[in-house]
Amino acid sequence: MMLHAQHMPGQPGAPSLVFLHGFSGDCREWQPVGEQFHGCSRLYIDLPGHGGSAAIPVGGFADVIRLLRATLISYNILKFWLVGYSLGGRVAMMAACQGIPGLCGLVVEGGHPGLQNEQARVERRLSDGRWAERFRREPLTEVFHDWYQQPVFASLTAQQRQALTALRSQNNGETLAAMLEATSLAVQPDLREALNALAFPFYYLCGERDSKFRALAQEVAATCHVIRNAGHNAHRENPAGVVDSLAQILRL
């Protein structure tokens, strides 16, 4: 089994760019950024529970990474950079730390490296469980209205919140809930030590208004790019800034 994806060919021999979206996004999320890099092959993946992969069930990160590997093989992608946002960034970090073959470098935007104590995991498990129950039972417009009131999204304007709520409400609440629980921060290991031992380039992107993840970026051995005029979802709030950072990172 493989994940649904959209593939855009590039020049032969260059590493591919593999893009992983955030929770409730899909393969379209990164395209305004990725399509600025025509020289590279680009693969935009729908994670399980999302988009064209909505019907694919997973029990945890191991299943997600197994599906990611199978998808890369199916597209004959042998050398690649992983670029992931939020949930996609956590999947990318997990894959990198487990030694996914062919990985040339890692770019994470607003991805959490992991909780560091059991009490935090218990609290996160309860919180994600409450959200999952809401995704299963309530109209998605109501759930996402509240979702985007969370402190991490404080930099969004009312208009941006309204647009995101309308966009994300096109999802399937049941499959979102399942993926939220399967890949909760409560079940993700603390990756800091493994990330600090990576043998390939690791870059971290965060919006200048995203104080939480700017602080987390200092806890991993990554070169940090701060995206101006952006909060947690920097590639949506300032795509040109993220394109500039990726061009520097990839030397394109």
Swiss-Prot record:
SUPFAM superfamilies to which the protein is assigned, alphabetical: alpha/beta-Hydrolases
Subunit record text: Monomer.
One annotated GO molecular function: 2-succinyl-6-hydroxy-2,4-cyclohexadiene-1-carboxylate synthase activity
Enzyme Commission numbers on file: 4.2.99.20
Family: Belongs to the AB hydrolase superfamily. MenH family.
Pathway info: Quinol/quinone metabolism; 1,4-dihydroxy-2-naphthoate biosynthesis; 1,4-dihydroxy-2-naphthoate from chorismate: step 3/7; Quinol/quinone metabolism; menaquinone biosynthesis
UniProt protein name: 2-succinyl-6-hydroxy-2,4-cyclohexadiene-1-carboxylate synthase
Keyword set includes Metal-binding: no
GO biological process, one term: menaquinone biosynthetic process
Entry keywords, A to Z: Lyase, Menaquinone biosynthesis
Its job: Catalyzes a proton abstraction reaction that results in 2,5-elimination of pyruvate from 2-succinyl-5-enolpyruvyl-6-hydroxy-3-cyclohexene-1-carboxylate (SEPHCHC) and the formation of 2-succinyl-6-hydroxy-2,4-cyclohexadiene-1-carboxylate (SHCHC).
Gene3D superfamilies xref list: alpha/beta hydrolase
Species in which this protein is naturally found: Salmonella paratyphi B (strain ATCC BAA-1250 / SPB7)
Family annotation (HAMAP family): MenH
InterPro entries according to UniProt: AB_hydrolase_1, AB_hydrolase_fold, SHCHC_synthase_MenH
Enzyme class: lyase
Catalytic activities: 5-enolpyruvoyl-6-hydroxy-2-succinyl-cyclohex-3-ene-1-carboxylate = (1R,6R)-6-hydroxy-2-succinyl-cyclohexa-2,4-diene-1-carboxylate + pyruvate
